Amino acid sequence: MIKGCGCSDGLTDRTRYEEVVLDTMLYSAQLKERVARQNSAVIVAMARMIAGTFEDGGKVLLCGNGGSAADAQHLATELTIRYRSSVERPALPAIALSTDTSALTAGANDLGYDAVFARLVEAYGREGDILLGLSTSGNSQSVINALDFARQQGMKTLALLGGNGGLMKGLADLELIVPHSGSADRVQECHITIGHVLIDLVERMLGYCRL
């Protein structure tokens, strides 16, 4: 049985809950606005890199842990299957490296978890491809190792980070750091929005919808 906090749920409590809703959603919106105003040029540059890679016959690999793994899978699916139903286009080659549980568990067991994504980059990545790493802290060693390996393979690298960028700051060719620390949730909300904007821009740059 799940027990509540034991507090009453009168009008005052409901008002406080509503304040939580407002505070949370308004802060999230303000953080996104700040990120957009400070990083619009970086987002456009990332989109150009992705669009150019697709034009050259390359692909995008994505990796992250936990909620960032879910974001990687979310964005890879929208590239390969569809982003908006109003845009008709062919599939765009993108692979989230967190989807194969057999590969993840074998890699964790045989190589150590920190080596898992780098091993998958070795398997799927080719010179000229892109690796997009997501980390709300910037300190995910498995993503750091994957970015390092990708660069050694001649791949281009992108990073969506949070806080102060952590250990991943400066590792990627292009990076965007969401300036929020202490919790992953607000950073993840920005990351998925940035991902959606990237896909929108890529579709426009490739001529599948109008600018």
UniProtKB/Swiss-Prot annotation:
Lineage: Bacteria, Pseudomonadati, Chlorobiota, Chlorobiia, Chlorobiales
SUPFAM superfamilies cross-referenced by the UniProt entry: SIS domain
GO CC terms of this entry: cytoplasm
Keywords, ordered alphabetically: Carbohydrate metabolism, Cytoplasm, Isomerase, Metal-binding, Zinc
Protein name per its UniProtKB record: Phosphoheptose isomerase
Domain SIS: 50-211
Keyword Methyltransferase: no
Gene: gmhA
InterPro entries: GmhA/DiaA, Phosphoheptose_Isoase, SIS_dom, SIS_dom_sf, SIS_GmhA/DiaA_subfam
CDD domains (alphabetical): SIS_GmhA
Organism, as annotated: Pelodictyon phaeoclathratiforme (strain DSM 5477 / BU-1)
Pathway annotation from the record: Carbohydrate biosynthesis; D-glycero-D-manno-heptose 7-phosphate biosynthesis; D-glycero-alpha-D-manno-heptose 7-phosphate and D-glycero-beta-D-manno-heptose 7-phosphate from sedoheptulose 7-phosphate: step 1/1
Cofactor binding mode and count: Binds 1 zinc ion per subunit.
